[in-house]
């Protein structure tokens, strides 16, 4: 999936890779346990989402952005609910927001902006398939560090 949003041109193309960190994302309510691959912006300002594991992009202060394909590792992400818990690096986060948005209405600069409290922002494709790995909507979930 590819879209232009603010200063960031964001794309997710399948790429089979191994984890490059010891981090594990867990979402017990959907039986998700995923290794993490830390990713960086490509030269063309895109992000490449790894296939079958979660990609982690350190977006801004207190905002860890996690992406994964809806046909593989994030296939059940749509089943999470507000109040469900996620774990990353032995820290517990509680889901505070759950949105399904049209791709054309997403402001990536807002999704990736700095947060006041430590936050995980998860995103995956949703809706009708347009072409290849591109869909009409995105599931965007934010979870804040449990106090």
Residue map of PLM features:
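Solvent-exposed, non-transmembrane regions of membrane-associated and secreted proteins
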Residues: 2-147
């Amino acid at each position: 999936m590819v879209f232009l949003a603010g200063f960031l041109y964001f794309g997710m193309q399948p790429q089979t890779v191994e984890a490059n960190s010891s981090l594990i994302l867990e979402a017990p309510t959907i039986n998700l346990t995923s290794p993490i691959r830390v990713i960086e912006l490509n030269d063309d300002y895109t992000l490449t989402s790894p296939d079958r594991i979660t990609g982690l992009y350190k977006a801004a202060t207190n905002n860890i952005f996690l992406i994964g394909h809806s046909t593989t590792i994030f296939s059940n992400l749509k089943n999470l609910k507000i109040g469900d818990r996620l774990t990353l690096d032995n820290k517990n986060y509680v889901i505070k927001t759950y949105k399904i948005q049209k791709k054309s209405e997403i402001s990536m600069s807002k999704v990736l902006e700095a947060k006041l409290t430590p936050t995980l922002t998860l995103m995956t494709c949703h809706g009708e398939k347009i072409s290849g790995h591109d869909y009409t909507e995105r599931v965007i979930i934010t979870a804040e560090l449990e106090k």
